[in-house]
C-alpha cells in the first residue's frame, strides 16, 4: 500500500577482518582472517536496517555488540556482552553506521581455526543479528 513502509531488518553491509582501523571505510583489510598470536585482531563493520528514534529535530540509533570465540565444534572459549554500546545522533536519517571491535590475541593461544561470533543488537527495535566468521590464529 502506498505510504506504508516495509519493516527493516538489521543487516551487515560490510564486514571484514582488518589489521588496523583508522576510521569510516579507512582500514587495512585482512581478507584471510589470519591473526598472529600476541597481536590485535580487528573486525570492521558497516551495519544498516536499524530502527531510528526521533527527538526534536534529531534522529538517533542505539546498538550494542557482543563478541564470542568458539571452536569449530561450537565450544565457547570466550564471550563478552556489550563490548560496544553505540548511541549516535543525526540531523538526517543515516543509511548505515560503522564501527570496529578488536581482540588482543593472547601469546599462548593455541594455533588453529576458530569461529568468531559477533552479535549486533538494535536496542530500539529489540532485534539482533548474529554473524559467524572463521578466523585463524597462527
Predicted features along the sequence, with ranges:
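Intrinsically disordered, low-complexity terminal regions enriched in Ser/Thr/Pro/Gly
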Residues: 1-138
